[in-house]
Every structure is written in structure tokens, then in C-alpha cells.
């Protein structure tokens, strides 16, 4: 048995912070998948023992794929699924051709974890419904559920783990991504630097806006509440941002920017 699949990054068309609850921030966001040259390729096959290969920047225990697999196994045990199915997950060789950077606001680790959970559910005929997969995904990381969903465009609420499909003409082939070299944004550090000025009360209106309208009527600072704190924590990022044209927007907590492909700007 060998299965291979591709996973793609996301960008946040908008990301608005509502308020802080405990250690984390409640937010609303529109996530869009971007299908281009930037992608990870994951292969899964049977092996004598578990093996995870890839150009990762963290210890195994912190790897999102490893975490997703452990949480999935515990969930299946709680459902009292066949022991042979759970045992087969212990003898997988997973190899990742890693191209999507982490700490870039593109869902680098969550992309792989969400894709793996979605495909393992199909490969092993686990028959988990979307809500069950979301329960697992939310324990892996906030962005994971967007990648489990396989939606091309979705609203994310709560801490980013509550996903709802947003019906619109997909932008997946109309966006291009720019990732600055050697700038890595810690999500935790950027959120810690965030200082709310006023409470945000327009969540419902924003969640109804088509993504294209957002990009055509708002600037990057207005669309993403994390841009300013990211620039405060990274002088090199601030230098780059100051040289970018208005057509560039900021994704997540950074460091990546994105825009509508210039050749297609006037197509609608």
C-alpha cells in the first residue's frame, strides 16, 4: 500500500481579533486555499515500524503530523475501533517533501496534519464524519480543521478551529504568495505584541463579504489585525513591508504576503 497526495497553503483574506479569552484570542477570519507551485507532497505506506521523514524544523513530539497521528489513535481507541486498524497506524512510513514554510502564516504544519487526517480517514475507511475529524483537528492546531475540510474558501471563528464553507468563486488559482527570506514569525510572539485599540463589533458583516470585495476595498492593515504587531516584532519584516505596493496583503501572523495575480486583476 502506497498513497501520495499534495497539500497546499492557505492565506487569510482577513483576520480580525474580537477579544482575548484566557490565554487565547477569539477571532474571525476568511481562509482561502492557494493552489500554485508552493505545495507539500506526502506519501504514506506500510512499513515494519513507524517512520516519519521530512525536512522538519522541530522535534518529533512537536511535529504536527506526529501529533495528529497520536490524537487520531487515541480517538479511535475511545470509539473502540478494531485493534488491527489502530495497530496499522503504528506501522506507517510517512514521508514529506516539505516546501510550505512554517512560521509564515500559511498553515505550514497544519496543512500537513489536516491533509493526513483527511486521507487516512479514506485510506483506512475509518468512517469518521467531518465533526469527528474536526474534534481531532482542533487538538492538533487551530488551522488544522480548514485543511481537513477541503474547502477552497471558509470562514473561521472561535479560535480559528470552527470552520464554515463560504460559497464564492474560488480564488485558489488567482493568488500568488511572497515569502520573505529568513524571516520567521512566532505566532505566540505576534499575538503577545497585539494591542487592541477598540472592540470589534462588525463580525457578522465581515463574514458575509466576498473575498474579492475585501481585497479590492480594504488595505492590508485594515484586513489583518496582526500586521502591526508582526512589524513591531520584526524590523526586517517592517523594512520589506514598507517597500511593498498596496496590492500586497498579509497572511495570518506572517511572514508571508499575497496578492491577486497582476494579469488577472481586471478579469471581473
UniProtKB/Swiss-Prot annotation:
It is an enzyme of class 2 (transferase). It catalyses: 4-CDP-2-C-methyl-D-erythritol + ATP = 4-CDP-2-C-methyl-D-erythritol 2-phosphate + ADP + H(+). Keywords: ATP-binding, Isoprene biosynthesis, Kinase, Nucleotide-binding, Transferase. Pathway: Isoprenoid biosynthesis; isopentenyl diphosphate biosynthesis via DXP pathway; isopentenyl diphosphate from 1-deoxy-D-xylulose 5-phosphate: step 3/6. ATP binds at residues 101-111. Gene3D superfamilies: 3.30.230.10, GHMP kinase, C-terminal domain. One of its GO terms (molecular function) is ATP binding. NCBIfam families: ispE, PRK04181.1. Catalyzes the phosphorylation of the position 2 hydroxy group of 4-diphosphocytidyl-2C-methyl-D-erythritol. Belongs to the GHMP kinase family. IspE subfamily. This is 4-diphosphocytidyl-2-C-methyl-D-erythritol kinase. The gene is ispE.
Amino acid at each position: 500500500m502506497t498513497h501520495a497526495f499534495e497539500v497546499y497553503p492557505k492565506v487569510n483574506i482577513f483576520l480580525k481579533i474580537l477579544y482575548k479569552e484566557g490565554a487565547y484570542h477569539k477571532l474571525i477570519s476568511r481562509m482561502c486555499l492557494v493552489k500554485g507551485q508552493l505545495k507539500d507532497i506526502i506519501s504514506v505506506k506500510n512499513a515494519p515500524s513507524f517512520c516519519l521523514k521530512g525536512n522538519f524544523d522541530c522535534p518529533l513530539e512537536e511535529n504536527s503530523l506526529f501529533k495528529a497521528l497520536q490524537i487520531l489513535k487515541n480517538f479511535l481507541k475511545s470509539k473502540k475501533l478494531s485493534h488491527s486498524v489502530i495497530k496499522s497506524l503504528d506501522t506507517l512510513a510517512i514521508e514529506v517533501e516539505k516546501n510550505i514554510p512554517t512560521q509564515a502564516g500559511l498553515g505550514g504544519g497544519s496543512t500537513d496534519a489536516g491533509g493526513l487526517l483527511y486521507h487516512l480517514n479514506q485510506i483506512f475507511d475509518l468512517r469518521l464524519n467531518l465533526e469527528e475529524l474536526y474534534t481531532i483537528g482542533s487538538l492538533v492546531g487551530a488551522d488544522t480543521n480548514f485543511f481537513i475540510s477541503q474547502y477552497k474558501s471558509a470562514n473561521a471563528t472561535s479560535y480559528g478551529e470552527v470552520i464554515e464553507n463560504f460559497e464564492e468563486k474560488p480564488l485558489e488559482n488567482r493568488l500568488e504568495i511572497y515569502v520573505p527570506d529568513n524571516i520567521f514569525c512566532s505566532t505566540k510572539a505576534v499575538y503577545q505584541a497585539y494591542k487592541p485599540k477598540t472592540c470589534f463589533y462588525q463580525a457578522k458583516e465581515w463574514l458575509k463579504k466576498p473575498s474579492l470585495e475585501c481585497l479590492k476595498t480594504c488595505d492590508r492593515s485594515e484586513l489583518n489585525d496582526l500586521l502591526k504587531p508582526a512589524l513591531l516584532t520584526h524590523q526586517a519584516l517592517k523594512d520589506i513591508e514598507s517597500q511593498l505596493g498596496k496590492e500586497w496583503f498579509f497572511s495570518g501572523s506572517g511572514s508571508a504576503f499575497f496578492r491577486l495575480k497582476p494579469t488577472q486583476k481586471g478579469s471581473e
